[in-house]
């Protein structure tokens, strides 16, 4: 529930310019890298009321953020960079282990109790910042 509340508050703040909120984000959580300078990963579920497309992702706390998808090809696990992800109206798109996910490259360390911000840029021109709940790497 805490994950949903944080993500919802960030979405509301991003849309406070008279726009209606047309995105819902659930279970936004971030796994930091095991070693400094490594790669973290972020997972979430997103639902758009209108047809849209995620065209870019970024974070002020990382060198880069990329959309990746894990698949299986002839029994071998394959991870591919995706240029974007379609958001069909009313359908939930899940970013989860073994499928779509965000790779967070060279992120700054996360302190206890902090969230990790990731911006999602949509084809419609909207930009949403999502606060991903996480825990410091141990």
Which residues make up each language-model segment?
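Compact, glycine-rich, soluble single-domain proteins
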Residues: 22-138
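Positively charged n-region of N-terminal signal peptides that target proteins for export
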Residues: 1-4
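Bacterial signal peptide processing site
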Residues: 15-19
């Amino acid at each position: 529930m805490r994950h949903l509340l944080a993500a919802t508050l960030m979405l509301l703040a991003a849309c406070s310019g008279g726009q209606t909120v047309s995105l819902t984000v659930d279970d936004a959580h971030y796994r930091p890298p095991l070693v400094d300078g490594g790669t973290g990963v972020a997972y979430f579920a997103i639902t758009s009321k209108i047809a849209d497309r995620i065209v870019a992702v970024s974070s002020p706390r990382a060198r880069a953020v990329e959309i990746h998808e894990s698949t299986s090809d002839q029994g071998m696990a394959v991870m591919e960079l995706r240029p974007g992800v379609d958001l069909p109206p009313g359908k939930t798109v899940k970013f989860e282990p073994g499928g779509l996910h965000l790779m967070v490259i060279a992120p700054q360390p996360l302190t206890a109790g902090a969230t990790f911000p990731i911006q999602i840029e949509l084809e419609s021109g909207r930009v949403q910042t999502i606060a991903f709940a996480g825990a410091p790497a141990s």
